[in-house]
Amino acid sequence: MTLLKSFEDLDYSEALESNKEAQDWLESNNRRFGQLINGKFVTVKNAKLIESLNPSTSELLAHIEIANSEQLESAVKSARKAQPSWEKLGGHGRAKALYALARLMQKHARIISVLETLDNGKPIRESRDIDIPLAIRHFYHHAGWAQLQEKDFSSYQSIGVVAQIVPWNFPLLMLSWKIAPALAMGNTIVFKAAEQTPITAMFFAQLCNEAGIPPGVINMINGDGVIGAELAAHKGVDKVAFTGSTAVGQSIRKSTAGQGKKLTLELGGKSAFIVFEDADLDAAVEGLVDSIWFNQGEVCCAGSRLLVQAEVAKELHLKIKRRIKQLRLGKPLDKSTDLGSLVSKTQFNRVSEMVQEGLNHGGEIYQACDIDEKGNYYPPTLITDVDSSHPLVQEEIFGPVLVSMTFRTQSEAVE
């Protein structure tokens, strides 16, 4: 073998992050989790269960109990009872609790990162270097705002009991976005994690007790869409904060109509990435990589629609194809991996079927490598030769699929 050939064949060696500490923690909890209600972990022997699986291996991580209506009622009542005293604690008192949570999350950041990757399938580099540090910073940040409340935000009032429902693409980060500001302003919480990714929420629930959060201030329930809908419609809730699909958001809006609840809905998207003929194409390609192939494309604001001026479309497409061939698709715990698994077999099948059905309406597909159905690995994908009416241009795919179309003028791109 020549020296040149050796360099051409160079590749990353496998560099797996150890998951022993995370597995030991799951074992210490008998791989089963119930609900956190009024400061206590509640389990029911004959509860209906959800299997939380590692999407890259189908390994069982834990059994998750689905909350029943009585447990939901108890969680809401506990939050209602705890709210007045939590509000009266004042901004400085609440800031102490938020700082305590932030420090504990920071202390356990490594195990949280591994649990997030095991449960979600995202690369450990993203969990370790982006998601978890950002989640921690949200608690530090809002602790600072809590300290300023009485002086700078005295005209603002707490809402009361807030129902919070999050998706599976950024489990702990979404939790922090919801919980930290609500706590800072004196609200109490009934939180529901996504049924696919509840593990880090359960770890956080244990940290709540360790941090000394008063009973009832943070209640956490598990379950599927049925219990989520019941939580959103509950008359004892003053506000619903939901992040997820557009269809579920529409359903929540209907169920809460006429109740006088405050409502925050962060729903799906189909963001456009526009490249003009005078752009730096190499820089544009790197922007595209971060925009659509970050987190396997499972991002509501992913730049999944590429609009490129016709004069440079061919050149840009070639550069994209060369670049995505360099992306590493593989084991999520490998520190050399760029794209991990899609979150579940259901999501893998959904993306695969959407792409196949979409191609029936035309378009050319390029994939950097073969599809690995066993590990739910869907390769970085580029689809070209489509127009604005194409289903893959109109519908959110929520996977590592970039759909490209051309334009001639700026006004045409905007339209």
Task: Set out the residue ranges of the language-model regions.
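Terminal low-complexity tails and localization/encapsulation signals of metabolic enzymes
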Residues: M1-H63, K96, A100, L148-V166, ...
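A structural signal for short, well-ordered beta-strand elements
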Residues: E51, E65, E87-K88, E277, ...
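Residue-level signal for inorganic ion chemistry
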Residues: S58, A79, G90, R94, ...
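Glycine-rich loop-to-alpha-helix module at the N-terminal edge of alpha/beta enzyme cores
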Residues: E59-Q149
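Structural signal for hydrophobic packing residues in well-ordered secondary-structure cores
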Residues: Q83, E87, A102-A109, S113, ...
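Rossmann-like NAD(P) dinucleotide-binding subdomain of oxidoreductase/dehydrogenase enzymes
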Residues: L148-A283, F407
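ALDH superfamily catalytic-core signature
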Residues: A247-D387, F407-E415
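Short, solvent-exposed loop/beta-turn-alpha elements that line the ligand-binding surface or hinge
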Residues: V393
